[in-house]
Amino acid sequence: MPKKRSSPNRNVQIADQIQRDLSDLLREVKDPRIGIVTIQSVELTPDYAHAKVYFTTLTGDPQQTLEALTHAAGHLHNQLFKRLHIHTVPTLHFHYDKTIERAVEMSRLIDEANANRAKED
């Protein structure tokens, strides 16, 4: 008999719940390397074994924040286990989300191109 797959909506719901719970849990982490962190998104594997957690930070060095989050991953996993009502709580893999930085750079390049075009006209 084929294994029953969970629906894509359930995957999204669980990812959203993990995002909300991690945001709450990060407020309780006392590591000074973790400044103001925003969890941008969570992507789950279909079997819920792994979660890619994308974050941004307003303060501090993103690399130091990544190291601190990776160090705290075990604790965060245990706390998620207490909050989530699913059989498997995923292993957390943190990734710095560069989307905002890329958007700012693209905006700067567009502004620069428009300024150059205005000078030529």
UniProtKB/Swiss-Prot annotation:
Coiled coil: none annotated. Transmembrane segments: none annotated. GO terms for molecular function: ribosomal small subunit binding. InterPro entries: KH_dom-like_a/b, RbfA, RbfA_dom_sf. It is found in: Cytoplasm. The keyword Cytoplasm applies. One of several proteins that assist in the late maturation steps of the functional core of the 30S ribosomal subunit. Associates with free 30S ribosomal subunits (but not with 30S subunits that are part of 70S ribosomes or polysomes). Required for efficient processing of 16S rRNA. May interact with the 5'-terminal helix region of 16S rRNA. Belongs to the RbfA family. Monomer. Binds 30S ribosomal subunits, but not 50S ribosomal subunits or 70S ribosomes. This is Ribosome-binding factor A. The gene is rbfA.
